[in-house]
Design a protein with these regions (language model features):
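Loop-to-helix transition at the N-terminal end of transmembrane alpha-helices
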Residues: 40-58, 74-84, 108-115
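Internal transmembrane alpha-helix with an interfacial aromatic "cap," most often the third helix
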Residues: 62-71, 94-102, 121-142, 158-161, ...
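Juxtamembrane non-transmembrane "cap" segments at the membrane-aqueous interface
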Residues: 213-235
Length: 276
């Protein structure tokens, strides 16, 4: 171990903790804005802006990673389109359905929201875990990218703001909001730590991914058993936030399954780096 490596291992954790000094206040500010001005989230503008920014970041990151792969320009372009077109169509279908109210309880007989949550994961996870091409892309991509991207999870603080206003039941809003905020707060510090390339950093990132997945498991379970529908077991004093309405329904219908797949990709990438 060189002096430079030791220096990097020492500096990275410090930078990670310093990142919390600006992420945490901004998260508190976002929560306060949604508490005092609930119309911000209800307008759909933050959701639309965030979704488009994430979509752009994923498309650029994928292209950058593909440029590092040993592929011809045509194969690189086709692979990029082969991933981004289905991903964009998925977003468009969910977005269009949400705007038109198809996820509202009683609109259709099928449990569309649970289907929207689980079906993409059931189909996508095996493909992402087994595809050799995806493995090549992950090998070419810095491990920091997939982790840092989930900084957007701090926007889950809207659940906490809704609970504080009395607009969402605590049995759902508290675990969902707290879990999302913790995952988002530590995304950048974990990513900074990963930049050192150490085994300890990869272990921390693996634990972070598992926590993020556990957060979704709890949030989805609590959301299903407290929301109107065939899976409801608990009837809270108020409906779960949004009750299938746009824009909030975009969180379980798209953000949750897409974030689960990002966790799956990150875990596969970390495993490949550890085995290398």
């Amino acid at each position: 171990m060189t002096a430079l490596t030791l220096h990097a291992e020492t500096v990275a954790p410090r930078q990670g903790w310093r990142a919390l000094l600006w992420i945490a206040p901004l998260t508190v500010l976002w929560t306060a804005l949604n508490y005092w001005l609930p119309g911000i989230q209800g307008s759909g503008i933050p959701n639309a802006a965030l979704r488009l920014i994430i979509q752009a970041l994923i498309s650029v990151a994928l292209w950058q990673a593909l440029e590092q792969c040993d592929l011809t320009p045509a194969r690189r372009r086709n692979l990029w389109l082969g991933i981004m077109i289905p991903f964009t169509l998925w977003l468009a279908v969910i977005w269009g359905g949400a705007v038109n109210g198809v996820f509202r309880p009683g609109t259709v007989r099928l449990p569309l929201l649970p289907i929207a949550i689980f079906l993409p994961v059931i189909i996508g996870a095996p493909i992402l875990l087994r595809s050799k091409r995806v493995g090549q892309v992950l090998d070419a991509m810095p491990t920091t990218w997939l982790v840092a991207l989930q900084l957007y999870r701090v926007f889950g603080a809207i659940f906490l703001a809704s609970w504080m206003r009395g607009a969402a039941p605590g049995i759902f809003a508290l675990p969902a909001g707290i879990g999302d905020v913790i995952t988002g707060l530590f995304a950048v510090p974990i990513a900074i730590s990963l930049a050192t390339g150490t085994l300890e950093a990869r272990k921390a990132a693996t634990a972070w991914n598992i926590f993020g997945l556990a957060d979704f498991a709890v949030a989805v379970f609590m959301g299903m058993i407290t929301s109107p529908g065939p899976f409801q077991l608990i009837v809270p004093s108020m409906p779960s936030i949004g009750a299938g309405a746009y824009p909030t329904v975009m969180i379980p219908a798209f953000a949750v399954p897409s974030s689960i797949l990002l966790h799956v990709l990150s875990l596969r990438q970390l495993r490949r780096r550890s085995a290398a």
